């Protein structure tokens, strides 16, 4: 009987959050280990389905770096990276688009649908969802001067047209977006999935942006998880070296989304089963929340 009472208490803890977020939009960036482990794939699918059933409009943006790397290797194509961005020539872009839209997107849609949801896959080219311009990288030369580097078909999202997402949501579908955008001349662009999630969240005036990662969240210099960070404190955390390396672009993605109107952003460990539900529907959460 005590176990049943504890289950009821868990549901009651979630109730105020369900009431608060019903009818709102949450955008989730899905990637990392959560995509590779069968048990985590199922828990992710069930989390997303539950959100939809309780009235939360859920949009998924997925990555696919490991799958792209594997396919490029099979084709004998060697990738170069500039400041963490893959140099994407026309041949590489063809492989990237094939993997993201033809393989990974279908897989994500498939396991949501197989577990009782109604997902619909699309890329940023569908309905001109993600309009891009070429992203140029500024790098420092050995002599200290700054040089602009063309890294190929890597896109900077300059416009989001969310009508197709709104139509899918009204139809009861969970949109699943592959991070491939389109240029003004119809050319395809490879886009960072975190950036896509942030831009889409802003365009939909989302309540939350959630980035699933392979780390527990933002940590202090002593290694302790920072469960909540005010937006105004983020620049200092970067300047003093608390936020470093690959966490910087993720945190920047969150702050950009908040500045554009998203209410809260979360960096959550996707290696934990039901990480999304634990972050949203519990009093403490399990990751890092950044709030305006």
Swiss-Prot record:
Molecular function as annotated in GO: acetylglutamate kinase activity; ATP binding
Enzymatic class: transferase
InterPro entries: AceGlu_kinase-like_sf (IPR036393), AcgluKinase_fam (IPR004662), ArgB (IPR037528), Asp/Glu/Uridylate_kinase (IPR001048), Glu/AcGlu_kinase (IPR001057), NAGK-C (IPR041727)
Any one GO BP annotation for this protein: L-arginine biosynthetic process
Keyword vocabulary terms for this entry: Amino-acid biosynthesis, Arginine biosynthesis, ATP-binding, Cytoplasm, Kinase, Nucleotide-binding, Transferase
GO CC, any one term: cytoplasm
Site annotation Transition state stabilizer: residues: 29, 250
Pathway in which this enzyme or protein is active: Amino-acid biosynthesis; L-arginine biosynthesis; N(2)-acetyl-L-ornithine from L-glutamate: step 2/4
Enzyme Commission number(s) of this protein: 2.7.2.8
Pfam families on file: AA_kinase
Cellular localisation: Cytoplasm
Positions with a binding annotation for substrate: 64-65, 86, 190
Location, primary (coarse class): cytoplasm
Family: Belongs to the acetylglutamate kinase family. ArgB subfamily.
NCBIfam families, per the entry: argB
Job of this protein: Catalyzes the ATP-dependent phosphorylation of N-acetyl-L-glutamate.
Protein name: Acetylglutamate kinase
The species this protein was found in: Geobacter sp. (strain M21)
Recorded name of the encoding gene: argB
């Amino acid at each position: 009987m005590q176990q049943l009472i504890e289950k009821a208490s868990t549901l009651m803890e979630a109730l105020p959050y369900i009431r608060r977020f019903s009818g709102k939009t949450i955008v989730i960036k899905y990637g990392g280990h959560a995509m590779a482990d069968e048990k985590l794939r199922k828990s992710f699918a069930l989390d997303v389905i539950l959100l939809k059933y309780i009235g939360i409009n859920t949009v998924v943006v997925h990555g696919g770096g490991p799958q792209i790397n594997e396919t490029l290797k099979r084709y004998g194509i060697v990738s170069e990276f500039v400041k963490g961005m893959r140099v994407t020539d026309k041949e590489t872009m063809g492989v990237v688009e094939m993997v993201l839209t033809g393989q990974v997107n279908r897989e994500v849609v498939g396991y949501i649908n197989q577990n009782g949801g109604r997902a619909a896959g699309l890329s940023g080219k569908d309905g001109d969802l993600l309009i891009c311009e070429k992203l140029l990288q500024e790098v420092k030369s050995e002599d200290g001067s700054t040089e602009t580097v063309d890294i190929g078909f890597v896109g900077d999202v300059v416009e989001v047209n969310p009508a197709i997402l709104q139509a899918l949501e009204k139809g009861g579908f969970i949109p699943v977006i592959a991070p491939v955008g389109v240029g003004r001349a119809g050319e395809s662009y490879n886009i960072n999935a975190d950036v896509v999630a942030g831009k889409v969240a802003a365009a939909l005036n989302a309540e939350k942006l959630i980035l699933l990662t392979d780390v527990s969240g933002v940590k202090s210099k002593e290694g302790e998880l920072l469960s909540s960070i005010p937006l105004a404190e983020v620049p200092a955390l970067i300047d003093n070296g608390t936020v470093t390396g690959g966490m910087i672009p993720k945190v920047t993605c969150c702050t950009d989304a908040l500045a554009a109107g998203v209410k809260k952003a979360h960096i959550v460990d996707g290696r934990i089963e039901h990480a999304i539900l634990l972050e949203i529907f519990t009093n403490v959460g399990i990751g890092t929340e950044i709030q305006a």
